[in-house]
Amino acid sequence: MTLPEDTTTAESLIHTSVLSAEVLEALAPTPGKTIVDGTLGGAGHTRLLLEAGAHVYGIDQDPFALDRAREAGLPNLTVLQGNYRDMVSLLEQAGVSQVDGILLDIGVSSFQLDDAGRGFSYHTEAPLDMRMSQSGESAADVVNTYEEEDLAAIIYEYGEDRLSRRIARAIGQARQKAPIETTVQLAEIVKRAYPGFSKGIHPARRTFQALRIHVNDELGALRDGLQAAETLLRPGGRLAVISFHSLEDRIVKRFLLGSEVLQPLTKRPVVASDEEQAINPRSRSAKLRAAERVVVQEAS
């Protein structure tokens, strides 16, 4: 991957992080605490945790995100390359067995969305990639090789799109003429499959979401990451999870309700204030759930 000219500073690293004040309240960072940012991304949340005095272990599978964090020279930040689903082993390799807090900001980060070349956005022309890392199959591999029935299942399950079969059929017909290689190609195919679309939310949004979730196994990673949090958090440690759609939020909610060692801090998810939503439209769908690691008393 070719990196841009090195103009990175601690200030330029920040992206627009959602629910920043709420995350700080949930994790309560103070000097001496060790906190894991399992989804480092643009390091917006990490910067705030560092300013509060915590030592942060930032995990990301995106090498570009890690390079930017290293170049920023943020003190008390240790970066680790990998998926947060593997954070137990990643931290063990760094000599850490327990932590005071864990943050998971699920999905694609703002700076990944804004990087046209990554293929996450249907608004700009780019190779149809969508991989957080550079390993595994890309979104182009999926749309060009999967059976229509399997494509429909992915779009329905992960995109919750009622027209999944119609979209899969349109993809199948289009790829018979030529491979689908770019984001705009796919977006136009999906748009044509929607009857009477004129304006509003682009009909490709759900399909792109579904492909991204599938390509990166995001829901599987979330389940593994939640289990890892139970292992890593010391008693009194806090977990904060930000999700952006109902699939993720349901997984987090059910996991916390079923956990014997994680006690939810709020009955309902925390959402962005009206002021934040006006400033940062991406925060409108964000939901924060937080929990505290408790000690389970063994029955006598």
Swiss-Prot record:
Membrane spanning stretches: none
Stored Pfam families: Methyltransf_5 (PF01795)
InterPro entries in the cross-refs: RsmH, SAM-dep_MeTrfase_MraW_recog, SAM-dependent_MTases_sf
rRNA processing listed as a keyword: yes
Keyword list, A-Z: Cytoplasm, Methyltransferase, rRNA processing, S-adenosyl-L-methionine, Transferase
GO molecular function: rRNA (cytosine-N4-)-methyltransferase activity
Reaction equations catalysed: cytidine(1402) in 16S rRNA + S-adenosyl-L-methionine = N(4)-methylcytidine(1402) in 16S rRNA + S-adenosyl-L-homocysteine + H(+)
Binding sites annotated in the UniProt record for S-adenosyl-L-methionine: A43, G44, H45, D60, D105, Q112
Leading EC class: transferase
GO CC annotations on file: cytoplasm
Keyword Amino-acid biosynthesis set for record: no
GO biological process, any: rRNA base methylation
SUPFAM superfamilies: Putative methyltransferase TM0872, insert domain (SSF81799), S-adenosyl-L-methionine-dependent methyltransferases (SSF53335)
The protein's Enzyme Commission number: 2.1.1.199
Compartments, as annotated in UniProt: Cytoplasm
UniProt family annotation: Belongs to the methyltransferase superfamily. RsmH family.
Task of the protein: Specifically methylates the N4 position of cytidine in position 1402 (C1402) of 16S rRNA.
Listed HAMAP family: 16SrRNA_methyltr_H (MF_01007)
NCBIfam families: 16S rRNA (cytosine(1402)-N(4))-methyltransferase RsmH (TIGR00006)
PANTHER family: 12S RRNA N4-METHYLCYTIDINE METHYLTRANSFERASE (PTHR11265:SF0), S-ADENOSYL-METHYLTRANSFERASE MRAW (PTHR11265)
Protein name per the record: Ribosomal RNA small subunit methyltransferase H
Taxonomic source organism: Deinococcus deserti (strain DSM 17065 / CIP 109153 / LMG 22923 / VCD115)
